[in-house]
Swiss-Prot record:
It is found in: Virion tegument; Host nucleus matrix. Phosphorylated. It comes from Equine herpesvirus 1 (strain Ab4p) (EHV-1). Pfam families: Gene66. This is Virion protein US10 homolog.
Length: 236
């Protein structure tokens, strides 16, 4: 792991003082904020999981090479994406096939990003903007492996949120009140565990009849065991 990050890879700068070397500013990275993945800090690099260390180093090196091409007015290196793609597919194949002894909250997202990258195919990329975005996704996949310790989340927050809404089809980030929603469900299940399945059945019944809003009950009847629905009754 240390050997993968302790020196410069193909001209890719490595900051050693805890500061990123111009990521996304046009110094070190490509113009117009492209190829922010061409730089990294030593502290961040060594904090990545060992399983992604070599791949992350290649992403950084390829990004630096592409950033140099961009600054010189050349197109993306023809072998840049095919090289990264082959290495990623091999690594992601092992990751997807390995059992997960302990569930990690980032695993579903990591698998979604991985499937998206695999589906892109190995054909060379024609534009720097597209290659830069793919390098960012590859780096994001790596950093999901240390999601709670990553020191570079700002590199992904804006770009990856936009990508998720338009490319992965996952939809928007869960609303801020999602925790309150689940807390209410847990409280209901804890208070009346034997009735909880019937509450769920009632909700399914209402949705099947076209109701999209919650059924509002008078406060005096909220503990009743029967809910009247358009002239019918659902007995709990």
């Amino acid at each position: 792991m240390d050997g993968a990050y302790g020196h410069v890879h193909n001209g890719s700068p490595m900051a050693v003082d805890g500061e990123e070397s111009g990521a996304g500013t046009g110094t070190g990275a490509g113009a117009d904020g492209l190829y922010p993945t061409s730089t990294d800090t030593a502290a961040h690099a060594v904090s990545l999981p060992r399983s992604v260390g070599d791949f992350a180093a290649v992403v950084r090196a390829v990004s630096a090479e592409a950033a140099d091409a961009l600054r010189s007015g050349a197109g993306p290196p023809a072998e840049a994406w095919p090289r990264v793609y082959r290495m990623f597919c091999d690594m992601f194949g092992r990751y997807a096939a390995s059992p997960m002894p302990v569930f990690h909250s980032a695993d579903p997202l990591r698998r979604a990003v991985g499937r998206y990258l695999v589906d892109l195919g190995a054909a060379p990329v024609e534009t720097h903007a597209e290659l830069s975005g793919r390098m960012l996704f590859c780096a994001y996949w790596c950093c999901l492996g240390h999601a709670f310790a990553c020191s570079r989340p700002q590199m992904y927050e804006r770009a990856c949120a936009r990508f998720f809404e338009t490319r992965l089809g996952i939809g928007e980030t869960p609303p801020a009140d999602a925790e309150r929603y689940w807390a209410a469900l847990l409280n209901m299940a804890g208070a009346e565990p034997e009735l909880f399945p019937r509450h769920a059945a009632a909700a399914a019944y209402l949705r099947a009849r076209g109701r999209k809003l919650p059924l509002q009950l008078p406060s005096a009847h909220r503990t009743a065991k029967t809910v009247a629905v358009t002239g019918q009754s659902i007995n709990f």
